[in-house]
């Protein structure tokens, strides 16, 4: 029984688990993509693997692109300064 659990766990680790999150997509140096139109953000987000995106008006970081179900390998805005 223990072998079955260990083999199942090993298979899970080998296949990898792709997770997603909702967040502001980030430029290099932890800056958000500024926006005025939802279409711009939706295109940007979907090109980076998200389900969709929209322009978050007057949000925490100003007018920035918010992505829905963005893959983990795409950088997101994290707390701290934007270093332009």
Curated annotation (Swiss-Prot):
Pro-piece positions: 84
Outcome of substituting residue 57 to G: More than 50-fold decrease in toxicity to mice
GO BP: any one term: defense response
Pfam families xrefs: Toxin_3 (PF00537)
Locations listed in the record: Secreted
InterPro entries on file: LCN-type_CS_alpha_beta_dom, Scorpion_toxin-like, Scorpion_toxin-like_sf, Scorpion_toxinL, Scorpion_toxinL/defensin
Leftover remarks: Exists in two forms, due to cis-trans isomerization at 28-Pro-His-29.
Annotated domain remarks: Has the structural arrangement of an alpha-helix connected to antiparallel beta-sheets by disulfide bonds (CS-alpha/beta).
Summary of the function given for this chain in its UniProt record: Alpha toxins bind voltage-independently at site-3 of sodium channels (Nav) and inhibit the inactivation of the activated channels thereby blocking neuronal transmission. This toxin is active against both mammals and insects, and is classified as an alpha-like toxin. It is active on Nav1.2/SCN2A (EC(50)=139-252 nM), Nav1.3/SCN3A (EC(50)=565 nM), Nav1.4/SCN4A and Nav1.5/SCN5A (EC(50)=195-500 nM), Nav1.6/SCN8A (EC(50)=214 nM), and drosophila DmNav1 (EC(50)=30 nM).
Designated name of the protein: Alpha-like toxin BmK M1
